[in-house]
Amino acid sequence: CAPTWRAEQEDYDLNFQQLVKSCKRKFGGEWVVLFRNHKYHKINTLKNQIDGEYVIDVSEYDDMQELICISNILITDYSSCMWDMLLTKKPCFIYAQDIERYTRRNGFYVPPSAWPFLIAKNNEELENNIMHFRDDIYQEKIKMHCKYLGCFENGNANKAIYDFVKEKLINKGIN
C-alpha cells in the first residue's frame, strides 16, 4: 500500500485486516501488507494496524522499485508508483476515498476513468474489486492503455541502448 502526499494530511482509513482476508480468499496463499507512507505525510490512524506480522511499515525503505518487484499486488491512490506497477503487469488497485475532491483540486493528465485499474472509494468497494478481479480483463486494459499513451516498454531497454551506442561508435570509426 502506497498512498500519495496530500496537503490536507487526512488519515487513510484502509482496513488492512480485511485487505489480507480478501487477498487470501481471491488469490490464495499467505499475505503480508507492506505499507509505505509518503515521506511527507504522517498518517496516524493506521499505526494501530501495523503489527509487524500481517502489516509491516516500510515507509523508511528508500527504493520503491524494489518494493514493487517483490509485491504481488499494489494498492495506492494517485501515487505515480501505479505506472511502475503497470509495467510489471501485476494487479494494481486504486483506493481513493477522496477522488472527487482530489480531481477538482489537482486534476489528472489522464482521467482516472481511463486508467486500467479498478477504483474503490471505500473498503467495501476495494474488497469487491479484489474479489471480482479478472486478470484477463486487466491485461487487456493494460495493453489498450499502453497503446493509447504510446508506451514503448518491451523489456529490451538495455539492449536498445547498447545497440544505439555501438552503432554511433562504429559510425565514428571506434570499435
Language-model regions, residue ranges each:
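A nucleotide-sugar donor-handling region in carbohydrate enzymes
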Residues: C1-D11, Q139-K143, I170-I174
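Conserved catalytic-core segment of nucleotide-activated headgroup transferases in glycan assembly
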Residues: C1-K47, E153, A157-K159
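Residues at the C-termini of beta-strands that transition into short coil/loop
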Residues: A2-P3, N37, S59, A96, ...
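Donor nucleotide-activated moiety binding/catalytic core segment of transferases
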Residues: L34, K39-W83
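Catalytic binding pocket for nucleotide-activated donors in carbohydrate/polymer assembly enzymes
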Residues: L46-D51, S80-G150
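C-terminal alpha-helical cap of glycosyltransferases
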Residues: N154-N175
